[in-house]
């Protein structure tokens, strides 16, 4: 496929995803998605994020009759003991989420979907993350900063939350919300130029 497109639609208001796209030189127009993000009964975390990423991309496509540029959508969730942790709805919930991961490994799943006139491609990035053992005081102090409020799993690895993480196995950008390797590959597949890269 000829690589000649230079812009995409981004189906997200996430400043982290915008920052990561800027990092790899991809220009975009934001067109937020609006879909039901409820978890299905007994749905696996991987299936959940793949479904939402695909749904977000296709929802935006439905509002773009011309579909003159590809649509990129993504969804991230944190999973511990098989339980999906979304964005906390309160400081109390954020504290409980962080306590459940304290001193333990958890998984961060980020799915991306790129929709174009040729259809929709999806990819999944899974990263294992080891959180340090956290005291109640440390958890309370972190939550009081407000950083956890709009983050799946109640922490942001790219901010103060990074001080709570001992190690990761996988994609740092995936934990931030947009795995760059998979994103670049899918965008190139549908004709988007990524500066300094090739197939």
From Swiss-Prot:
Keywords: Cytoplasm, Hydrolase, Nucleotide metabolism. Its EC number is 3.6.1.9. SUPFAM superfamilies: ITPase-like. It catalyses: dTTP + H2O = dTMP + diphosphate + H(+); UTP + H2O = UMP + diphosphate + H(+). One of its GO terms (molecular function) is dTTP diphosphatase activity. It comes from the Bacteria. Its main location: cytoplasm. The record marks 16, 76, 158 as: Important for substrate specificity. Nucleoside triphosphate pyrophosphatase that hydrolyzes dTTP and UTP. May have a dual role in cell division arrest and in preventing the incorporation of modified nucleotides into cellular nucleic acids. PANTHER family: BIFUNCTIONAL DTTP/UTP PYROPHOSPHATASE/METHYLTRANSFERASE PROTEIN-RELATED, BIFUNCTIONAL DTTP_UTP PYROPHOSPHATASE_METHYLTRANSFERASE PROTEIN-RELATED. Belongs to the Maf family. YhdE subfamily. This is dTTP/UTP pyrophosphatase. It comes from Methylobacillus flagellatus (strain ATCC 51484 / DSM 6875 / VKM B-1610 / KT).
């Amino acid at each position: 496929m000829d690589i000649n497109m230079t812009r995409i639609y981004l189906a997200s208001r996430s400043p982290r995803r915008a920052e990561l796209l800027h990092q790899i030189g991809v220009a975009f127009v934001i067109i937020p998605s609006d879909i039901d993000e409820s978890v299905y009964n007994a749905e696996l975390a991987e299936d959940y994020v793949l479904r939402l990423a695909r749904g977000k991309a296709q929802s935006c496509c439905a509002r773009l009759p011309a579909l003159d540029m590809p649509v990129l959508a993504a969804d991230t969730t944190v999973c511990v003991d098989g339980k999906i942790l979304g964005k906390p709805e309160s400081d109390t919930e954020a504290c409980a989420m962080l306590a459940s991961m304290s001193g333990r490994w958890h998984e961060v799943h980020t799915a991306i979907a790129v929709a174009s006139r040729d259809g929709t491609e999806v990819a999944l990035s899974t990263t294992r993350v080891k959180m340090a053992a956290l005291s109640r005081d440390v958890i309370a102090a972190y939550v009081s900063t407000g950083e956890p409020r709009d983050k799946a799993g109640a922490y942001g690895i790219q901010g103060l939350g990074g001080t709570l993480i001992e190690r990761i196995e996988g994609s740092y950008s995936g934990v931030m919300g947009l795995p760059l390797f998979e994103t670049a590959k899918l965008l190139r597949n549908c004709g988007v130029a990524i500066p300094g890269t090739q197939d």
